[in-house]
Regions:
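A broadly tuned "polar low-complexity/structure-edge" signature
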Residues: 25, 132, 167, 176, ...
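Catalytic cores of alpha/beta
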Residues: 96-99, 163-182
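C-terminal accessory regions of radical SAM enzymes
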Residues: 170, 183-188, 193-247
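General N-terminal targeting signals
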Residues: 36, 96-98, 132, 173-175, ...
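Conserved SAM/AdoMet-binding glycine-rich loop
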Residues: 4-157, 162-165
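Short, surface-exposed, charge-dense and proline/glycine-enriched linear segments
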Residues: 45-54, 109-116, 143-150, 180-195, ...
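C-terminal, active-site-flanking charged/polar segments
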Residues: 1-16, 135-142, 176-205, 209-213
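Functionally constrained cores in energy, signaling, and assembly domains
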Residues: 63, 74, 117, 140, ...
């Protein structure tokens, strides 16, 4: 139980009232699951790509209740969700998604929240199995509308990736332009892709083929060229302040 774990943390002699991150790898998938019969095999195989599966129960109500329960515990001054929020799931939940994000803005963000679009090239996003830019922009606009509504000085930061299988230098230049013009940011949280065992991306890296194995894809393996992809993105550019949509 997360509540019991929080209670144990509160009893620790070094606890000072702040839970630094309730997020984890996928903060807002708490209590989500497949609405299909468990005995019935799934023919889709992916819950979140190319879109959120209609059978996935994406409601954020249970997590809203969890957050409220944790911050009501005696001894808890603040409980932050610093990372791990899947922005596509927030936007897919028409009933509770905005309420969940508003709950975060009001009570659970210390100043900035990190989300992980990873890229903006449609071709690279398809290989990653990640949602498109429309979802990202919609989430960004909603986030800043809510921060404006509640008078909060909060910001989004973006986790991005260089040299993923299929990603070229041109793709990184496209990502740089998007980050500068649409996200109004000079990216700093940039990782060079590392092929981890038993992952789909690692299979693409070693095989040089798309996930279905039907088409060859470009894979940058030269160390200096992989670093160059990152350097394109982290180079400083003159930008204005983040644009906040009108309420």
């Amino acid at each position: 139980s997360i509540i019991r774990e929080a209670q144990r943390l509160i009893r620790h002699p070094d606890f000072r009232g702040v839970i630094s991150d309730l997020g984890g790898p996928t903060a807002n998938m708490y209590a989500m699951g497949c609405g299909r019969n468990a005995a019935s095999p799934c023919k889709v195989g992916q819950c979140l790509f190319p879109g959120v599966c209609a059978s996935l129960e994406t409601g954020h109500k249970a997590q809203i209740e969890l957050l409220r329960a944790i911050r009501s515990l005696p001894g808890v001054k603040k409980a932050f969700v610093a990372s791990g929020v899947r922005h596509d799931l927030v936007m897919a939940d028409a009933k509770y998604g905005e309420c969940y994000l508003e709950e975060l803005v009001k009570h659970h963000i210390s100043g900035q929240m990190k989300i992980a679009p990873e890229h903006t090239s449609v071709r690279v996003l398809d290989l990653m199995g990640k949602p498109g830019n429309e979802c990202l922009i919609a989430f960004k606009d909603l986030f800043y509308r809510l921060t404006r509504k509640h008078g909060k000085k909060q910001f989004l930061t973006y986790y991005l990736m260089a040299a993923h299988p299929g990603c070229t230098l041109d793709d990184m230049q496209e990502l740089k332009r998007f980050a500068t013009s649409e996200l109004r940011t000079n990216p700093e949280q940039v990782q060079i892709f590392t092929p981890l065992p038993s992952t789909r991306s690692a299979a693409m890296y070693h095989a040089g083929k798309d996930p279905c194995g039907k088409h060859h894809i470009f894979v940058e393996k030269d160390r200096l060229h992989r670093q160059r992809q990152k350097d394109v993105l982290t180079a400083r550019a003159a930008i204005g302040k983040p644009r906040r949509p009108k309420p």
